Amino acid sequence: MGKPRRMMNRLRMGALPPRYSFVLNPHVRERFTKCPSCAASTRIRKLPLVVHVEHPGGPRLVLLNKTCRLCLMCETLIVDRVELENVIIAAGLSATVKPPDYVVLGTIDRRTWRRGLGDHASLLDIREHMADFKKYLKVDVVPAHGERSSRSAG
């Protein structure tokens, strides 16, 4: 007898079907030229992202066109945390040099992103043209050469 499948009833913000697995890369020196999920080569793509940012004046929904790494085989999207935080700070969404709390919610179609640049996109419009992420992944980097021994030479 098989186990019954559980249906995950997860609330979604976007109306479009979920797309991409998402990785926020916390490692400064790792650029993931190979996918952490399937080891296929990743491609550089510029994609419009929807980011929820905590702001002193109230929470904001920000549309950012960000250069990311994308695995076409398993549809994993990799965004560098440091680069994303620098864009958030440069956009004036942080009152200090420290980046605010944020969550990358999903992707949005390019046409809606362009309308959002001129403040012509409403929240309803963003939700209609947004795709949430299928899942959020966490990546741990293991050094290729292992740790060097600390033995002293003779």
Where are these regions (language model features)?
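Short cysteine/histidine-rich metal-coordination sites, predominantly Zn2+-binding motifs
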Residues: L49-P59, N86-V97
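Short recognition patches in nucleic-acid-associated and regulatory proteins
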Residues: R31-L64
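Long, contiguous alpha-helical scaffold regions
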Residues: V87-G154
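Short Cys/His-rich Zn2+-coordinating modules
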Residues: R10-L24, P48-R60
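Iron-sulfur (Fe-S) cluster-binding segments and ferredoxin-like electron-carrier domains
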Residues: I78-N86
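Short Cys/His-rich local motifs and their 1-3 flanking residues in nucleic-acid-associated proteins
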Residues: S37-A40, L72-T76
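Residues immediately within or flanking Cys/His clusters that coordinate Zn2+
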Residues: R29-F32, C68-C71
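A composition-biased, non-transmembrane "mature-region" signal
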Residues: L24-P26, C35, I89
